[in-house]
Amino acid sequence: MMEVLLRLLVTQVILLALATSFVSCYDPNPLQDFCVAASETNRVFVNGKFCKDPKSVTANDFSYSGLNIARNTTNFLGSNVTTVDVNKIPGLNTLGVSLARLDFAQGGQNPPHIHPRATEILVVTKGKLLVGFVSSNQDNNRLFYKVLKRGDVFVFPIGLIHFQMNVRRTRAVAFAGFGSQNPGTIRIADAVFGSNPSIPQEVLAKAFQLDVKLVRFLHIVFGPPLW
C-alpha cells in the first residue's frame, strides 16, 4: 500500500515539475506589432514598456480623466474612438487590460478592423448599434451580427474582423474593454489600400477581382495625402 502511495506521489511531483517548466518557458504575448532582436545594447526596446521606479509611482500613473466627454464625429466615418491604453495610463503596463470610448454620429460607423493582440467586449450606453464579426476561413467566414440597444453587451474574439454602425437617427455611445494593455488596431481598407509603400495594383486587382483603374483610385482615397 505504501509503495502505491509513493508511486502516486512521485508521479504527481513529476507532473507538477513538467507543468511548471512549461509555464516558465512560455513566451509572453507580443505587446506591439514586432520586437526585433537588438545586437546594440544602446538601442534596446522591450516587449511592452520599461518599469518606473516603484518609489516614484503616484496615483496619477493609474488614472485618466475626460472619458465622459463626447468626441467630435464630424469626419467621413461619422465616428470617433478614444483609446485609453498603456500610453494614456502608464499603470496599465503588464496588467493586460485597456478600454476605449466610441462615439457615433447618425449613420456613423467604426469600419471593419481587427485588434491583433486582444479580445474586445463592448457595451452600448446610448442609442442602437449594428455590430458583428466574421469568423476565419477555416469556419467559412461566417458573419455573426446583432443590433444592440442601451445596456447590451457583445464580444469580438481576438484577431477577427469586426465592425460597429449606428442604426438610429441620434448619436450613439459605447465603451469597449480589451484584453491587452496595447491591443492595436488594423482597419482593413486602410491597411490594404493605404499601405506604405503601396501593395502592387496587380496584386489587389486579382485578389479583389477589380479593375486596375479602380484599385488606383482606392490607393488615392486610402493612401497618404498627396500634398
From Swiss-Prot:
Q: Which UniProt keywords apply?
A: Apoplast, Disulfide bond, Glycoprotein, Manganese, Metal-binding, Secreted, Signal
Q: Would you tell me the protein name for this molecule? A: Germin-like protein subfamily 1 member 6
PROSITE patterns from the UniProt entry: GERMIN (PS00725)
| Keyword NAD appears in the UniProt entry | no
Q: Does the keyword Secreted apply?
A: yes
Residues modified by glycosylation: N72, N80
Where in or outside the cell it occurs: the entry states: Secreted, Extracellular space, Apoplast
Classification via SMART domains: Cupin_1
The set of disulfide-linked cysteines is C35-C51
Primary location = secreted
What family classification does the UniProt entry report for this protein?
Belongs to the germin family.
Organism taxonomic ancestry: Eukaryota, Viridiplantae, Streptophyta, Embryophyta, Tracheophyta
